[in-house]
Design a protein with these regions (language model features):
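N-terminal Rossmann NAD(P)H-binding glycine-rich loop of SDR-like oxidoreductase domains
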Residues: 2-24
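Conserved beta-loop-beta element that borders a ligand/cofactor-binding pocket
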Residues: 161-183
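NAD(P)H-binding glycine-rich loop region in Rossmannoid oxidoreductase-like domains
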Residues: 49-97
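Glycine-rich NAD(P)-binding loop of the Rossmann-fold in SDR/ketoreductase-type enzymes
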Residues: 61, 93-104, 151, 155-156, ...
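Substrate-positioning beta->alpha
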Residues: 155, 159, 196-220
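Glycine-rich "substrate-gating" loop/helix at the edge of Rossmann-like oxidoreductase active sites
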Residues: 148-151, 178-186, 196-208
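Conserved Rossmann-fold NAD(P)-dependent oxidoreductase catalytic core, especially the SDR/UDP-sugar
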Residues: 100-150
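Mid/C-terminal beta-alpha module of Rossmann-like enzyme folds, strongest
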Residues: 207-243
Length: 243
């Protein structure tokens, strides 16, 4: 039975991924890293004594906590970190958390005796390539990284991605996620919504598709040439709805 270490499991994408992985608990042991907040402890309480789930209470910025999660893992799904709108209100903290988390993931993986066998999945962001204003509406994975210097979230994702891909980890992949469409998204009212240019375009990814992605990337049928590449992630043409 393989062990999957998942960070960010209590966030939108991470939770969807965890639920999909949990359906495969007869084949995978699931290890989660979560901050011991009241919200997280309540959310994960039903799994506290589940033999298929191991919860590491800790923080991405603490190397020992990250190492406890990585040790013995076959896959590392690094979804955790600070995202908008919190990232917009706390830009410097976002930079520190997201970069330090990537550094700790790399350090922990390379410290393992079986480091070459551990596959690392990093969740990046299409924000790394900047806004898609006319006439450049189409994004490709080969496009240059072009983050706004004032968008600390985007900058942090660029730096963190480079830390992962240039680390010497033998098998990695960067999945640059777009905006996640999840139930209740319209209830999140924040002035940061106006940071999105009115003439920009966006192809959403549903939270369900995002969860299936995380659960499928750990399957044996994933081809070898999938690894050591960059991918843009979305739910397809039918989700080109709004900016």
């Amino acid at each position: 039975m393989k062990t999957v270490f998942l960070t960010g499991a209590t966030g939108n994408m991470g939770w969807a991924g965890f639920r999909e992985l949990y359906r495969k608990r007869d084949r995978f042991k699931i290890r989660l890293l979560a901050r011991p907040s009241r919200k997280n402890m309540k959310l994960l309480e039903p799994y506290a004594h589940d033999p298929a789930v191991e919860i590491v209470w800790g923080d991405l910025t603490d190397y020992n906590d990250v190492c406890a999660g990585v040790s013995g893992a076959d896959y590392v799904l690094h979804v955790g970190g600070m995202v908008s709108p919190a990232a917009d209100y706390f830009p410097e903290k976002t930079l520190e958390v997201n970069v330090t988390a990537a550094e700790n993931i790399v350090k922990a993986v390379l410290a393992q005796k079986n480091a070459d066998d551990i596959k690392v999945v990093y969740i990046g962001s299409v924000a790394q390539c900047g806004d898609r204003l006319w006439p450049v509406h189409w994004g490709r994975t080969g496009d240059p990284v072009y983050a706004s210097r004032f968008d600390r979230y985007s900058v942090s994702k660029c730096i963190a991605e480079k830390i992962i891909t240039d680390s010497g980890i033998r098998k990695w992949v960067s999945l640059r996620q777009t905006g996640i469409l999840y139930p209740g998204i319209l209830k999140v009212l924040s002035p940061t919504a106006f940071h999105v240019p009115i003439q920009g375009v966006l192809e959403w990814a549903t939270v369900e598709d995002s969860g299936r992605l995380l659960a499928n990337v750990v399957e044996d049928w994933v081809p070898e040439d999938f690894w050591n590449r960059f991918y843009n992630i979305s739910s397809g043409e039918q989700y080109r709805m709004t900016n």
